[in-house]
Amino acid sequence: MSRLALAMVLPLALPFAASAGTLKLYTSQPNEDAQKTVDAFQAAHPDVTVEWVRDGTTQLMARMAAETEAGVPTPDILLIADTVTLEGMAQEGQLAAYQSPEAENYDPALYSDQGYYYSTKLITTGIVYHTGAGAVPSSWADLAGADYKGMVAMPSPLYSGAALIHLATLTTNDDLGWDYYQALADNDTRAEGGNGAVFKAVASGEKPYGVLVDYMALRARAEGSPVEFVFPDEGLTYVTEPVAIMADAPNRADAEKFVDFVLSEAGQELVVEMGYIPARNGVDSPEGFPARDSLKLMEFDAARTLADTEANKTRFSEVFGVQ
């Protein structure tokens, strides 16, 4: 890391060389969600003070690298976008193994069996369409059909982490695979930007169909936007905003309390209040969302996705002719 990069990061980092008894959280949650999470945890544990930093996952990883090089203490806890990032950190020995007693309420696919990270919500990816669209898709395969040629927008896996996980999941599915992505490209599917750009294109009618994370479409529909959302027949890809404890967490005891809280029934009810599908079994989804136990989640391997990331990006660039 350059001296310039360190100089830019350290003024932000030094205030968080926290005093004993505080819990330091780094999160990629939206600011409002992060504040609600911290407030609820501190209400349940009034003896713990939480200091938190919010940024994108990539930016947080860069910040921690700079802080490590500068000798600044790491955060105690991470609550970030996806399991692939945390799988990489686990493989590098950066995360602590913690067997939360709350894990018994979660599907094994939603947490590290060694206790390195735990999913806290389900943000699924499905199909959004404009209410003025002619056909209503029911499957991922539909989007590659002639009726949808030039009419579909999707986020680019070169830009969006959720889109990269979506690609990794579908391309390892026996019924879809890379042939499906080639068919999308041949069907003049537009792949660029993130989920926000896709939603804007569909809601405005520029593109009748899109590949999108669930909450953007369902919240907008509830507010009167002319969109509908489909949970495809083949199943859903998903990201889970997992929580993890750093291996050298200065405040390990309170970090464990934080993990247990966000996984608890109360913590998951908070997830519902924020407008997301809970990861915990037995907790009702928000109004307008499907029941948690009705979701068909596609098989996903975080370790394989991590290993295949660069190859997947390269192949996607070749298939879609983008950089």
Briefly describe each language-model feature range:
Residues 84-88, 208-226, 275:
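A ligand-binding cleft/hinge motif common to bilobed small-molecule-binding domains
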Residues 96-102, 115-119, 141, 209, ...:
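Short beta-strand->loop
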Residues 28-35, 57-58, 73-206:
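Extracytoplasmic ligand-binding site segments that recognize negatively charged/polar headgroups
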Residues 246-301:
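Mature extracytoplasmic/periplasmic domains
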Residues 24, 28-51, 65, 220:
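Short, polar/charged alpha-helical segment
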Residues 126-133, 168-171, 240-251, 270-271:
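A bilobed periplasmic-binding-protein/Venus flytrap-type ligand-binding module shared by bacterial periplasmic
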Residues 288-323:
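Extracellular/periplasmic bilobal clamshell ligand-binding domains
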Residues 123-124, 181-185, 191-192, 223-249, ...:
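Periplasmic-binding protein-like
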